[in-house]
Structures are given as C-alpha cells and as structure tokens.
Amino acid sequence: MIVRSLSDILDGPTHIKSDAFESRRIITARDGVGYSLHDTLIRAGTDQRLEYKNHVESNYVIAGEGEVENLLSGEVFPLSDGTIYTLDNHEPHMIRARTDMRVVCVFTPALTGGETHDKDGSYDG
C-alpha cells in the first residue's frame, strides 16, 4: 500500500514548476503501479500547446475554468470542475486557462517525476 500526502512532495524533485503550471507528481514510475498521478495547477491567462506522443493522459478538472482545443479537428471543449478529458490518440492540443485551474492528471506509461515538456510539448517515452 502506498500512502502519501501532497505535502510530502512539495518543493521536491517531483514538484515541477513553470510560468504556466505546477505539476505535483504524487505517484510516479518508481511506485510500480503502471501509471503516474499528478495534482496540477494551471495559471489563469495561460495557453499551453501540448502533444503527448509517448503517453496517454486523462485529466479531471476539480477547480477553475478554461478550454481544451483539439488541434487536429479544431474542436474546442469548455473545461470546469467535474469535466474529464482523455488524450487517447496522442492529440496535439491547446489548454487555455481562464481562471486558475486545478486538475488531477493520470499518465500511462508512468512518468518518473522529473520530466519537463520538450519543444513539441511532449515528454520522452
């Protein structure tokens, strides 16, 4: 059994910060469960172009408002607390945060915890 608190990882090696977001990676590859789980804060007024070429990601919005755009189809979906979206086909997408957002993210395969986005908005496989 793994029991961990958010406070256990704050300001540690799995707490990744950028101008647009903070990713607090609570469960990582070292835990051996096949996925990673992140508590992510997205800053109001930010736009992020992302494309996870090597991972499937599910995102559950628990606070805030914004939108996600599928850059292949042009479809735009509103995001607010209680909304989930999954990037099951590695879609390039744009996240726009209208307010500060808090999102629970699940990645498979699991991230090791220290990854940062490359120039394409992806992580290495």
Which stretches of residues belong to each language-model region?
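A short, N-terminal "cap"/entry segment at the start of jelly-roll beta-barrel domains
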Residues: M1-Y35, R49, E115-G125
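Short strand-connecting beta-turns/loops that link adjacent beta-strands
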Residues: D31-G32, S73, D100
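Conserved short histidine dyad/triad with adjacent acidic residue
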Residues: S36-K53
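Conserved GNAT-family N-acetyltransferase fold
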Residues: T40, N59, Y85
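Tight coil/turn sites that cap or link beta-strands
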Residues: R43-G45, D81-G82, D88-H90
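Short beta-strand His + acidic residue motifs that chelate non-heme Fe in jelly-roll/DSBH
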Residues: Q48-L50, V68-E69, L87, P92-R98
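A short beta-strand-loop-beta hairpin characteristic of the jelly-roll/cupin
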Residues: K53, S58-D81, E91
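Ligand-binding loop in jelly-roll beta-barrel domains
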Residues: N89-G114
